[in-house]
C-alpha cells in the first residue's frame, strides 16, 4: 500500500466507529513544527504531583552515592568527591561548557561555533539527533561527519477529528509524503578550543506516477535553510545555552546578507567561482554547499585546498530504484549504471582577501566540461 493512500484507507476502515462520536466537539492542540518519528523518541511522562500535595524538596544529604569509578577508600576522600565542586567537575566531563556558543552566517549558510574540541562535542551532538527522533546511519568521527537516516516529520500530518479521537490506535497508518535527513560536520574552529558545527538538510517527497495513483516514486526537494537554522538553534540549547539566548542569536543572523560569490569565465571557457571570503571561511562554506547539493566527500586535503567528492543520488540512498532529479539531467550519471559515479575534485584557493573555487580534472588541470560548469552553478546557488 502506498503511503499517500494510507490516510484514506485508515479513515474508511474506522468510519463505522465514529458514528456515535459525530456530536462530539473539542479543540485540537497546535502541532509542533518538528516531531520526527522514531521508536526510541517516545519518553515516559514524569510523575505528576496531586493538587493537594507539594513536590518534595531534594536534599543532597540523602543522595545515592555517585559511581565515578574513583573508588574512595576513606571517608575524607569520599566526602571530597561528594563536594559541590567535585560534582560540578564531574558534570563538566559529561557535557562540555558552551557559554561562548554563537551562530555565524555567511550568505545563506549558518553554522554553530561552540566551545570544546570535535571529539568532546561528538557524543552530545549524537545524543541530540537521537533525542530529536532520528536514527544515526553514518558515523565517521575521524572525518567529523555524522548523518541521520531518512525520517518523516510527524508534525506535518493533519490533526483532523478522526486522528485526534483514535490517537495512537491507528497512528502508525498515517504518514507524510515527505522525508528528511541531516548531515552534521564538526571541524576545529579558527579560534583554538572551538568547533564549527555545520548542519545540512536533504529532503525527498513522494509523487504519483500513474493516472490510477497506484504507484509512487520519490523525488528530491530543495534543502531548507530555515529548517537547518532551527536545528542549529535546538542544538545550541542542547549543548547548554539558554532558550532565549539561542533564539536571539538565531534572529540576529536573519539579516539579509550581501551577495558573497560570483561566477566568472576564462577565455578558454573554464569557470571559476569567486567567493568574497578568506580561505578558512570559504573552505567551510564549500564543504557545507557540497553536503547540501548531494555530494559525498570521500576525502579532503585542506593543505592543498582539495575536496574529493562523488555525487550520491538521493533516491538510491532512499532505497528506490527510480532515477533522481539530478540524474535525469545526466549531470552526474556514469556511463554504466553498474559502475560507481565519477569522482570530482573541488579546488579552493586563497586569493588575497578572497578565494576561488574550481573543478579540476584527474590530471590536475582546470575542468572545462559542461559537467564542471553545472557543478559550479550548483555551488554558486549555495555560496552567493
Curated annotation (Swiss-Prot):
Q: What subcellular compartments does it reside in?
A: Cell outer membrane
Q: Where do the record's region annotations for Disordered lie?
A: 47-70, 251-273
Checking InterPro entries in the record gives: BamC, BamC_C, NlpB/DapX
Q: Could you say which residues form the signal peptide? A: 1-23
Q: Name one GO biological process term.
A: Gram-negative-bacterium-type cell outer membrane assembly
A Pfam family found in this protein is Lipoprotein_18
Q: Which PROSITE patterns match?
A: PROKAR_LIPOPROTEIN
Q: Which residues are listed under lipidation as N-palmitoyl cysteine? A: 24
Q: Identify the keywords attached in UniProt to this record, alphabetized.
A: Cell outer membrane, Lipoprotein, Membrane, Palmitate, Signal
Q: What membrane topology does the UniProt entry give?
A: Lipid-anchor
Q: Which GO terms describe its cellular component?
A: cell outer membrane
Residue positions bearing lipid (S-diacylglycerol cysteine): 24
Q: Give the protein family.
A: Belongs to the BamC family.
Q: What does this protein do?
A: Part of the outer membrane protein assembly complex, which is involved in assembly and insertion of beta-barrel proteins into the outer membrane.
What assembly does the database describe for this protein?
A: Part of the Bam complex.
Protein name per Swiss-Prot or TrEMBL: Outer membrane protein assembly factor BamC
Organism, scientific name: Accumulibacter regalis
Taxonomic path: Bacteria, Pseudomonadati, Pseudomonadota, Betaproteobacteria, Candidatus Accumulibacter
Amino acid at each position: 500500500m502506498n503511503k499517500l493512500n494510507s490516510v484514506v484507507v485508515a479513515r474508511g476502515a474506522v468510519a463505522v466507529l465514529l458514528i456515535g462520536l459525530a456530536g462530539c466537539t473539542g479543540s485540537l492542540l497546535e502541532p509542533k513544527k518538528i516531531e520526527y518519528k522514531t521508536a526510541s523518541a517516545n519518553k515516559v511522562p514524569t510523575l505528576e504531583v496531586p493538587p493537594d500535595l507539594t513536590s518534595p524538596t531534594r536534599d543532597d544529604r540523602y543522595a545515592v552515592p555517585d559511581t565515578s569509578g574513583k573508588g574512595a577508600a576513606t571517608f575524607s576522600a569520599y566526602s571530597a568527591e561528594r563536594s559541590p565542586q567535585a560534582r560540578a567537575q564531574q558534570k563538566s566531563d559529561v557535557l562540555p561548557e558552551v557559554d561562548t556558543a554563537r551562530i555565524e552566517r555567511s550568505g545563506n549558510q549558518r553554522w554553530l561555533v561552540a566551545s570544546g574540541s570535535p571529539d568532546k562535542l561528538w557524543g552530545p551532538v549524537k545524543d541530540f539527533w537521537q533525542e530529536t527522533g532520528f536514527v544515526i546511519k553514518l558515523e565517521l568521527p575521524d572525518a567529523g561527519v555524522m548523518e541521520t537516516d531518512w525520517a518523516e516529520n510527524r508534525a506535518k500530518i493533519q490533526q483532523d477529528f478522526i486522528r485526534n479521537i483514535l490517537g495512537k490506535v491507528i497512528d502508525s497508518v498515517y504518514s507524510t509524503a515527505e522525508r528528511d535527513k541531516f548531515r552534521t560536520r564538526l571541524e576545529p574552529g579558527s579560534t583554538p578550543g572551538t568547533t564549527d558545527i555545520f548542519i545540512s538538510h536533504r529532503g525527498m517527497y513522494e509523487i504519483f506516477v500513474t493516472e490510477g495513483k497506484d504507484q509512487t516514486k520519490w523525488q528530491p526537494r530543495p534543502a531548507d535553510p530555515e529548517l537547518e537554522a532551527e536545528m542549529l538553534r535546538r542544538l545550541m540549547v542542547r549543548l547548554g545555552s539558554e532558550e532565549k539566548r539561542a533564539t536571539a542569536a538565531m534572529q540576529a543572523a536573519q539579516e539579509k546578507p550581501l551577495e558573497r560569490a560570483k561566477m566568472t569565465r576564462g577565455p578558454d571557457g573554464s569557470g571559476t567561482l569567486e567567493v568574497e571570503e578568506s580561505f578558512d571561511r570559504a573552505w567551510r562554506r564549500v564543504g557545507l554547499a557540497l553536503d547540501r547539493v548531494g555530494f559525498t566527500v570521500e576525502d579532503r586535503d585542506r593543505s592543498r585546498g582539495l575536496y574529493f567528492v562523488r555525487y550520491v543520488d538521493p533516491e538510491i540512498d532512499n532505497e528506490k530504484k527510480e532515477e533522481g532529479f539530478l540524474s535525469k539531467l545526466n549531470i552526474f550519471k556514469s556511463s554504466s549504471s553498474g559502475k560507481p559515479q565519477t569522482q570530482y575534485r573541488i579546488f579552493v584557493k586563497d586569493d588575497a582577501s578572497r578565494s576561488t573555487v574550481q573543478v579540476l580534472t584527474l590530471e590536475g588541470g582546470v575542468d572545462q566540461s559542461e559537467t564542471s560548469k553545472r557543478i559550479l552553478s550548483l555551488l554558486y546557488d549555495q555560496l552567493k
